[in-house]
Amino acid sequence: IAWVFGVNGKNFIKTMLRIGKERGAASVVDDQIGSPTYTYDLARLLVDMIQTDKYGRYHATNEGLCSWYEFACEIFRAAGIDVKVTPVHSDEYPAAKAKRPMNSRMSKEKLTENGFERLPEWKDAVARYLKEITW
């Protein structure tokens, strides 16, 4: 799993919404790519998995790829918030607490090969998530 967001706890979406409200602008790295993962969708997949004998190691994220910058832009678009989002390179972003991989995409072929339904598109997941939270 990667780039996880859900109703409980802190996550990138909640952080972006807070920054967007407080500042009206955000600087977000545009050179790291991956796939966001909604905990609700992941939980559905895990329930499906435990009802089988298809054990093993799987990669599971919502479908599609984006950069953190594209993720932030979609969050604000889906939330209907007008925020100026500025793309920056990782080496220009001093606030990073941990080094992140430039490419965290994962192959999810094993899911399909074993008959599991892949998680929905990440943009769809963001839209559904925003309906679930109070912000």
Where are these regions (language model features)?
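Mid/C-terminal beta-alpha module of Rossmann-like enzyme folds, strongest
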Residues: 45, 52-97, 102
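Hydrophobic "lid"/C-terminal helical patch
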Residues: 16, 46-50, 72-75, 126-130
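Catalytic phosphate/metal-binding cores of nucleic-acid and nucleotide-processing enzymes, i.e., regions
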Residues: 40-47, 51, 56, 130, ...
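Short histidine/acidic/glycine/proline-rich micro-motifs that form metal-
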Residues: 2-6, 33-35, 62-66, 93-94
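Conserved C-terminal active-site "lid" loop/helix of NAD(P)H-dependent oxidoreductases
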Residues: 67-73, 90-134
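Tryptophan-centric aromatic hotspots in well-structured domains and transmembrane helices
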Residues: 3, 12, 55, 68-71, ...
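NAD(P)-dependent short-chain dehydrogenase/reductase
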Residues: 1-34, 40-41
